[in-house]
């Protein structure tokens, strides 16, 4: 019932905004006046049960809705009612902006359009810049240890703050500060400790990495990597391979840290256009000419059927693969005018893939949707992605 009301309200808001007053049209039902007159706490209760995909349209229904949608109280209500959703965020460096920009993937809810023809013409998803009515705040970098969740800011100015909360509680509280201020650091949990790296000024290079022990509530510096191993750009992510930290950068090199020997070294870049991701208990590999899955029974990679059209679309320019609500989310770019030698802009494209293992053991993939989500200058740089539940 609440979702039906959301669709009606969003449709009314779109119609009133998109058509001139002089044009005769069929009147769409407006949101019930009684609902708008309710106390804020009851409106929040309703909004918290509606998928966030409706929020951009609902925010133009009234000022009350707009203020409540961007409020922290709505996040608390969604946590209380267990209606939180997963959201995919990307961080891009655009040539005309001095600081990195965060975007959130907005996915159109089913039944959002009235006409079937409009569904086919309009995009299923798009990247929306943060902040917006869809994502009011820059996403936090979140890691968990036992029953506690720790978070770091991914924005400017640099901050020493680390937050912590119990998984059953929505309220964040301050944890012991890091030893230096960091902007967009990266964090990883190993041996029940939190390793934090990057994001600090050159003058703070002695504290480029540090580790937090929740038992003692103290920070300790990591050994200082040599200058060539301290990246000039934002660290993309950390991967644990055979007991070592592989620090993936957006520079021409990566680095590796051995926590046992406490030593840094140069790491080889992963194979180009071979992006691997785990969905459930299965590993998938996206390569220039094929999609593969790893069969644990025979310990070998096998071809995924049904994705030949997508193979042609993203055979080059693959940016990222992530697990998203039990499916595989792909991000890639391509020139807006591929036949030209020099192209000023690129399309960033996204696709959602579901998988089905059949009786013969063969895995088939299905493209749930695929479209262009953003147009950017060709000189842009992809910095990082994250999936957050909120």
Swiss-Prot record:
SMART domains: FBOX
Keyword entries, A-Z: Kelch repeat, Repeat
The UniProt record lists the keyword Cell cycle: no
Protein's recorded name: F-box/kelch-repeat protein At4g39753
InterPro entries, per database record: F-box-like_dom_sf (IPR036047), F-box/kelch-repeat_ARATH (IPR050354), F-box_dom (IPR001810), Kelch-typ_b-propeller (IPR015915)
Annotated organism of origin: Arabidopsis thaliana (Mouse-ear cress)
Per-repeat ranges for Kelch: 139-192, 193-243, 245-286, 288-321
Residue ranges of the region described as Disordered: 1-33
Lineage, top ranks: Eukaryota, Viridiplantae, Streptophyta, Embryophyta, Tracheophyta
Superkingdom as given in the UniProt entry: Eukaryota
Domain F-box stretches: 32-79
Pfam families the record matches: F-box, Kelch_FKB95
Annotated Low complexity bias: 1-16
